[in-house]
Every structure is written in structure tokens, then in C-alpha cells.
From Swiss-Prot:
Keywords: Cytoplasm, Methyltransferase, Nucleotide biosynthesis, Transferase. It is an enzyme of class 2 (transferase). The active site is at C159 (nucleophile). This is Thymidylate synthase. The gene is thyA. It is found in: Cytoplasm. It comes from the Bacteria. Homodimer. Pathway: Pyrimidine metabolism; dTTP biosynthesis. Belongs to the thymidylate synthase family. Bacterial-type ThyA subfamily. SUPFAM superfamilies: Thymidylate synthase/dCMP hydroxymethylase. Catalyzes the reductive methylation of 2'-deoxyuridine-5'-monophosphate (dUMP) to 2'-deoxythymidine-5'-monophosphate (dTMP) while utilizing 5,10-methylenetetrahydrofolate (mTHF) as the methyl donor and reductant in the reaction, yielding dihydrofolate (DHF) as a by-product. This enzymatic reaction provides an intracellular de novo source of dTMP, an essential precursor for DNA biosynthesis.
Length: 279
């Protein structure tokens, strides 16, 4: 995962100091990319321990089409707690857009099912795309996430907003476009989540895995993470060997996976580094 540390160092060295929605402030760069050959190991950050249960459960939650934080909370996953209503509602975020995109003519599109069918039947298509960016349901930045949900909008605009698949030589690759990237807290989750999704869809489509390509718009470090015990502590650490992902069974569909289906052999990270969340 040297590419991840190199990007973090790039932001430290070359970033612009900017204000942001949260009021914390960031140092950011624009237009960067990382590439991971999934044949070389699973791209899980090793310079700090990453909470795998949260990553897996969140992805399964997206795939369920759920926008109810209660499902995550019942599994002791707290990553969405700050933005949800008391009843768990988060508005039409990722799960709804992936599984139930509402069209003006009344149709509802299950983008995940459609893209898997296209990978199977039209692997050379250049339209193997899933988008979470629905301008009609984006939040109003002048009010709170909770008030947005009450008005039928997303609690948060999607940060990882569009991904595309590519099939060649019997391998499935994925490119993610992430408009806004919290490099310290969010990006390790995002890398692992989309790499895992690529493995899952490849298995469902009887393909090997190729590359995961992670493309960024605004890639930033929050100012309160630019401290000796957070960002600079991570930069001092040496990356370790990547783990190997083992998927223990093949469910009948992409929607049948469970937490216990995934094992990450050889994951030996450095200790966790805690950091505050910008809300």
C-alpha cells in the first residue's frame, strides 16, 4: 500500500489549505489516481488496523438497497450514526441509488442487477457503470443532514459517486471516481470496499479479478488530522505484506453474501490510529 502513503505525502507536500463544509478545514490536492493489481493481494491498508467488519457490513448494507442505519447499528457498526435520524433513516443515499433509482417515467432501476447482467452478456460494453450521483436528491448544504432526510433528500452527498467495470482477458477490473476523499479515515475503507465488490462480482460472473483503479477529485487531509500522532505517525510506518482474500462460498446471487463468507489471510497491520470525524 505504498501508493496510499505516497498520496498522503503528496497532500502534505503539495496541498492547498482550504475551508470546507464541516468548518474543520483541509489540505487538498485535485485529480489523483491509485492503481492496485488485485492479483497481487487484497489492497487493505497495513500501516494502521482497519475495521474489516464495518467495511463488509456497510457494503452488504448498500447491496441490500437499505438506507436504514438501524441495520448497521444492530451489528455494532457506527460509521453512519452522526448523520441518521433517531429512527435510522438516512434518506436516499447509496443503497437506494444502487438498487432503486427512481426515473421520471415511474420506472425503478436496479443498477447492481443490471450491471452484473451486462457483464455476463455484454462484457465488451463501455456502459458497465453504476452511479450514486442523483442531483434531484442531493442534500441542501444550508441545513443539517437530519433536516435533509426529513425533507426527503440524502443525509450526505455521495463521496464515492460513480464506478465502472471493464472485462478483458477473463478478468474484471473496476474504476471508482471519488469526488471527495477523506484520505486518512475514509479512503482505506473505500479502497477495501470496492476491491471487495470487484471480487464478489467477478466470482458471480465466473471471472478472475484484474485491477482496482481509484480516481480522485478533491483528495484531502483534515487539518485536525495533520498532527504528529495521526497523519505523521502513519507516514513513519512501513507497509507490510498485503493479505489474501478468500471467499468461502459462492451464493446464488450478489445479494446472498454474509460477513462469514470472507476471510483475509495474513492481515497483520500496525496498531490502530484514532482520529476525529469531521461532521
Amino acid at each position: 500500500m505504498k501508493a496510499y502513503l505516497d498520496l498522503m505525502q503528496d497532500v502534505v507536500d503539495n496541498g492547498f489549505d482550504k475551508g470546507d463544509r464541516t468548518g474543520v478545514g483541509t489540505r487538498s490536492v485535485f485529480g489523483r489516481q491509485m492503481r492496485f493489481n488485485l492479483q497481487d493481494g487484497f489492497p487493505l491498508v497495513t500501516t494502521k488496523k482497519v475495521h474489516l467488519r464495518s467495511i463488509i457490513y456497510e457494503l452488504l448494507w448498500f447491496l441490500k438497497g437499505s438506507t436504514d442505519n438501524t441495520w448497521l447499528a444492530e451489528r455494532k457498526v457506527s460509521i453512519w450514526n452522526e448523520w441518521a435520524l433517531e429512527n435510522g433513516d438516512l434518506g436516499p443515499i447509496y443503497g437506494k441509488q444502487w438498487r432503486s433509482w427512481q426515473c421520471h417515467d415511474g420506472r425503478v432501476i436496479d443498477q447492481i442487477s443490471e450491471v452484473i447482467e451486462q457483464i455476463r452478456t455484454k462484457p465488451n460494453s463501455r456502459r458497465l457503470i453504476v452511479s450514486a450521483w442523483n442531483p434531484a436528491e442531493l442534500p441542501d448544504e444550508s441545513i443539517s443532514p437530519q433536516d435533509n432526510v426529513r425533507e426527503g433528500r440524502m443525509a450526505l452527498a455521495p463521496c464515492h459517486c460513480l464506478f465502472q467495470f471493464y472485462v478483458a482477458d477473463g478478468k474484471l477490473s473496476c474504476q471508482l471516481y471519488q469526488r471527495s476523499a477523506d484520505l486518512f479515515l475514509g479512503v482505506p475503507f473505500n479502497i477495501a470496499s470496492y476491491a471487495l465488490l470487484t471480487h464478489m462480482i467477478a466470482q458471480q460472473c465466473d471471472l478472475d479479478v484484474g485491477e482496482f483503479v481509484h480516481t480522485f477529485g478533491d483528495c484531502h487531509l483534515y487539518r485536525n488530522h495533520l498532527t504528529d500522532d495521526i497523519v505523521f505517525e502513519q507516514l513513519r510506518r512501513e507497509p507490510r505484506a498485503l493479505p489474501k482474500l478468500v471467499i468461502k462460498r459462492k451464493p446464488e446471487s450478489i445479494f446472498g453474501y454474509e460477513l462469514e463468507d470472507f476471510e483475509f489471510e495474513g492481515y497483520d497491520p500496525s496498531p490502530v490510529i484514532k482520529a476525529p470525524i469531521a461532521i
